[in-house]
Every structure is written in C-alpha cells, then in structure tokens.
C-alpha cells in the first residue's frame, strides 16, 4: 500500500488539500496501481523488440508549395483588439 508520505507528496505536487478519508481512499487506489505495475514488471519480454507505437508510423509529406494567404483585413477581422496591423494580446511575461 502507498505510504502517507507518498500520498502527501503527490497531493502537494497537485496542489490538493486532502482530508484523512480522501488520503485513505487515494492510498488504496495508488497501492492498486502500483500492484498492477509490479505485475507488468514480471512479464517476460525477452525477444520482444521495443516499440513506441503498436503499428509502424510513417510521415506522409505534402509538397511545400506557396499558396495565397489571408489579407491583413481578413486575418484581423475577428481580433478583439489590434494595432498597426497586429493583434493586441495581454502581456503574459514580465
């Protein structure tokens, strides 16, 4: 079973304030998840080639041909605020 320390740590990382009842519930659930992971660790994968996807993934490239774009007026038509042909947005970085 997951320890209270693990539950407190995970709750802190997720910025959650848990009641003792919630901690007990989540400790049981986390313990169940860890048990399933232990079961997966026991699976014999000798001779199995590692993969990132169940099926082969290939990129399909389209020709990079220039195409007409939007006019400035069309691009800014729905912008809530604009200045000098640019969209004005709130500052997000100090």
UniProtKB/Swiss-Prot annotation:
GO molecular function, one term: glutaminyl-tRNA synthase (glutamine-hydrolyzing) activity
InterPro entries cross-referenced by the UniProt entry: Asp/Glu-ADT_sf_sub_c (IPR036113), GatC (IPR003837)
Keywords: ATP-binding, Ligase, Nucleotide-binding, Protein biosynthesis
GO annotation (BP), single: translation
Reaction catalyzed: L-glutamyl-tRNA(Gln) + L-glutamine + ATP + H2O = L-glutaminyl-tRNA(Gln) + L-glutamate + ADP + phosphate + H(+); L-aspartyl-tRNA(Asn) + L-glutamine + ATP + H2O = L-asparaginyl-tRNA(Asn) + L-glutamate + ADP + phosphate + 2 H(+)
Disulphide bond pairs: none
Pfam families tied to this protein: GatC (PF02686)
Claim: Protein biosynthesis is one of the keywords in the record: yes
Role played: Allows the formation of correctly charged Asn-tRNA(Asn) or Gln-tRNA(Gln) through the transamidation of misacylated Asp-tRNA(Asn) or Glu-tRNA(Gln) in organisms which lack either or both of asparaginyl-tRNA or glutaminyl-tRNA synthetases. The reaction takes place in the presence of glutamine and ATP through an activated phospho-Asp-tRNA(Asn) or phospho-Glu-tRNA(Gln).
Oligomeric and partner information: Heterotrimer of A, B and C subunits.
Protein name from the UniProt record: Aspartyl/glutamyl-tRNA(Asn/Gln) amidotransferase subunit C
Record organism: Opitutus terrae (strain DSM 11246 / JCM 15787 / PB90-1)
């Amino acid at each position: 079973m997951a320890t209270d320390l693990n539950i407190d740590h995970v709750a802190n990382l997720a910025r959650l304030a848990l009641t003792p009842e919630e901690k007990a519930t989540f400790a049981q659930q986390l313990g169940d998840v860890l048990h399933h992971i232990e079961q997966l660790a026991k699976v014999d994968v000798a001779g199995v080639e590692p993969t990132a996807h169940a099926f082969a993934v290939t990129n399909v490239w389209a020709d990079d041909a220039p195409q007409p774009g939007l006019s400035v007026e069309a691009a800014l038509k729905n912008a809530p605020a604009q200045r000098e042909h640019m969209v004005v947005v709130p500052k997000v970085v100090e």
